[in-house]
Amino acid sequence: MVQDGNPPDDNVFRAFCNALYNTVDAPVTWFRETVVEPNQKKYPWYHQNYRRVPTIDQCYDDDVVCDFEANAQFKRDRAVDSEILSILRQRYEDCMMYEQPDHATKCRSLWDKYKSAEEAWFIKYGDLGAYGDARKAYMKQKHRMVWERRNGPLSDLTK
């Protein structure tokens, strides 16, 4: 008897082991393919939502794990914000190429959205450098808030 495209097995012991295996495996495989898999939600791995972890201001000074999680969350947020900014820039560039003679008027709304998002990104992540982490960003935010309390707002986004 040929199973799964393999030639028949001449060894009696292996044939017995395969028969025993198939008596257990066949009902399990049938149940999984006919009952479990059709009722499962198809959820791609790239749509995974991560839970929010405590921010750096909620961590204790000696809590290394909380610091690590806050930095990982900060890096994820920076990557998402950078990708949003890149998408807005690409939309503006596409509009500019498509509407070439009057792109200044037709793409103005995209330009305003991009500049607003760029300003918000720079307020949060600008001047941190390549090795900026959550604690440095928190200190930057704290110093900016102190400066604005003394001298007034720097931007329309921080009023």
Swiss-Prot record:
InterPro entries: NADH_UbQ_OxRdtase_su10, NDUFB10. Belongs to the complex I NDUFB10 subunit family. It is a peripheral membrane protein. Accessory subunit of the mitochondrial membrane respiratory chain NADH dehydrogenase (Complex I), that is believed not to be involved in catalysis. Complex I functions in the transfer of electrons from NADH to the respiratory chain. The immediate electron acceptor for the enzyme is believed to be ubiquinone. Complex I is composed of 45 different subunits. It is found in: Mitochondrion inner membrane. The keyword Electron transport applies. This is NADH dehydrogenase [ubiquinone] 1 beta subcomplex subunit 10. It comes from the Eukaryota. One of its GO terms (cellular component) is mitochondrial inner membrane. The lineage of its organism: Eukaryota, Metazoa, Ecdysozoa, Arthropoda, Hexapoda. Keywords: Electron transport, Membrane, Mitochondrion, Mitochondrion inner membrane, Respiratory chain, Transport.
